[in-house]
Amino acid sequence: MKRPKLRKSSKRLSCHKRYKIQKKVREHKRKVKKEAKKSGPRKHKKDITVPNAAPFKAQILQEAQLRRQQQEELKQKQKLDRQKEVAKKRKLEEKKNNNSEKKEKRDKKRKETKTPDDPDVVLCRQVNKVLEQSDVIVEVLDARDPLGSRCSQAEEVVLKSPNKRLLLLLNKSDLVPREMVEKWLQVLSAELPTVPFRCVAQIQDKSEKKKKKKVPVSADLVTDPKCPGGQVLLKILHSLCPSHNEAIKVGVIGFANVGKSSVINSLKQSHVCNVGPSKGTTKFLQEVRLDPQIRLLDSPALLVSPHNPPVALMLRSASESKVDVLAAVEAILKHCSKQELMLHYTIADYRNSLECLTLLAHRRGMLKKGGVPDTEGAGRLLFNDWMGARMKYYCRPPDSPVCQPHISREVVAAMSSGICSEELAMDNASTLKALKCPNSANIVVFASVGPTSAIMDETQLVDPEPELIEEELEENDGEEEEDMEEEEDDDEGSEEEEDLEAKSLTQEVTSAKEKDSKSAGPAVSFDQAADDDTYDFNTDFV
């Protein structure tokens, strides 16, 4: 049976589509021609071949291959030379830039002497100003670490002037067990008059103070049970006044976070000095009139010398910005009892500071994304607890009383003149009875590192080694020049090796030529002039 004819699709198009296709084709051809014109006419390189009938064909091809290899090697060598030149230029430019940067740094270090605008210089000058203007100096000590918060340099400055008196105030006595405070009072009172003290926790601001009857501040302080030790301190200061008509200036000094401004606020019974949980709140000298006979001078914190142990640097630093919290926690953990710290925070045993902070972060729920413990936050928490009142710790006094080298018997007699030691001991005993001291079983024992040295002269803050800095920079420049010379020697050595390789290659080729010529017979010169065109049977016929 004949199959039905299948109907093929028609090739007819609409005019719109056909003209569109033709237009696209024309545009494509035009574009191709344009690009061909840009590149220029292609020149096909003719392959220069050696006919088979030519004698010494193998030798000629070998020579051609050798020339090609030499040209390629020459190109590679030129390329390497260009790269080396570019690298040298780049190194020279970098060296110039580095030299200019080093000069700028050198100039900055030369100019970076401590100017009067520097905060450390300002603090040092303010402290010295307080020491000069004061008749009586009250050094505030932290009862948790009295030896570590004591500054022998400041005491020496005070004791050099014969008319000044020096007292010790054992602040934060309510954070230490009573027996420890009694022992520290015995140790410190053997050198200078010492008074235990506790600041008032909450003081009403002057702007929010209600109208009251005018009562002398000293009389109000005597009857105030919230400030133990204030009555004893005022009694001593009044006994040191030369007369009722003359007033004395009392300078309050000490390291950061010992409570200097809080002591003045507690004595004044009003918020006259700025206080805060952060270190270094007081920046300038402030005079407060306590009563007609006593004027208190609030001073900034003493500047810690960088030659102190790490624990003293962390705990006594005048600003929190200079304190590395993790390093501070590591230094603190090395000097405190592990068992008591574990009981305080209810954490397991740990091997190092990082493991302790990890356990503390898990205990307090301080976790980041993915359950990663926030060790920085835990370190900040532990450091703030240590600096504040949450973490209760104390230092044991020395077994045998060690007198400071700058305090002699004459100094002890001069400082205690006009002050009855028996009355002071009785007053201190009554003050200790009024304090609510914690039990020693729940407190961490801390190993003190001794007195903390401070910077009292602003010239010690100036950078004293500009010449050493210049010598170091010159040494670095000399080392860079030596490196450049070594690189140049290496480049010359590599070039010599390449020349030797090329010479050896040419020698091998010439030896191969000689062997071929000996085996093939006398060489034929194709470049010979066409003078001997006549045929000679004797010479031409072989």
Curated annotation (Swiss-Prot):
The keyword Nucleus applies. GTP binds at residues 171-174, 254-261, 298-301. GO terms for molecular function: GTP binding. Residues 65-104 have a biased composition (Basic and acidic residues). It is found in: Nucleus; Nucleus, Nucleolus. Residues 472-500 have a biased composition (Acidic residues). Keywords: Coiled coil, GTP-binding, Nucleotide-binding, Nucleus. The keyword Coiled coil applies. InterPro entries: G_CP_dom, Gnl3_N_dom, GTP-bd, GTP-bd_ortho_bundle_sf, P-loop_NTPase, TRAFAC_YlqF/YawG_RiboMat. One of its GO terms (biological process) is regulation of cell population proliferation. Residues 1-46 have a biased composition (Basic residues). SUPFAM superfamilies: P-loop containing nucleoside triphosphate hydrolases (SSF52540). May play a role in regulating cellular proliferation. Belongs to the TRAFAC class YlqF/YawG GTPase family. This is Guanine nucleotide-binding protein-like 3.
